[in-house]
């Protein structure tokens, strides 16, 4: 029997993981909401991971920014549902501003640390949110189910393509 995580979140948005298991990622700094727009906090999650790891688009969207801010390389993807996915401390981007990307598509290469942030945009109001709210990684967002045949469970599709289909709604 295969063990699979199935989303049970009330939200229709489940983002694709920005890296795969070969990255050996470890959280080094959790999301901490700032008290005000310019107040201290951590507006995303920071990971330690294997340098040169592939980074993947968390959702369908369009690359809205790719470049340096200060001495840090960033990539931002504007999703189809008014979210901005930020990849920071990347080594390089493999996509350019204006490129359409699909959930699960390789978009960048990591350094040995990586920042992942999510902003929700409502008109002129921008709000940083905890990426864990959308990543299908915690027990609060998923339950484990036992199935005899993984392919039958996914209708003949792989687990990865099923997760990607969920990310298309973000």
Labelled PLM ranges:
Residues 110-123:
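Active-site loop architecture of trypsin-fold serine endopeptidases
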Residues 46, 76, 86, 109, ...:
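Conserved beta-strand positions that form and line the central face of beta-propeller blades
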Residues 57-92, 114-117:
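Zn2+-dependent peptidoglycan hydrolase active-site motif and core
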Residues 52, 92-93, 123:
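Glycine-/small-residue-rich active-site loops that bind phosphorylated ligands and cofactors
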Residues 5-73, 102-103, 129-170:
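Surface-exposed, glycine-biased beta-strand/turn segments
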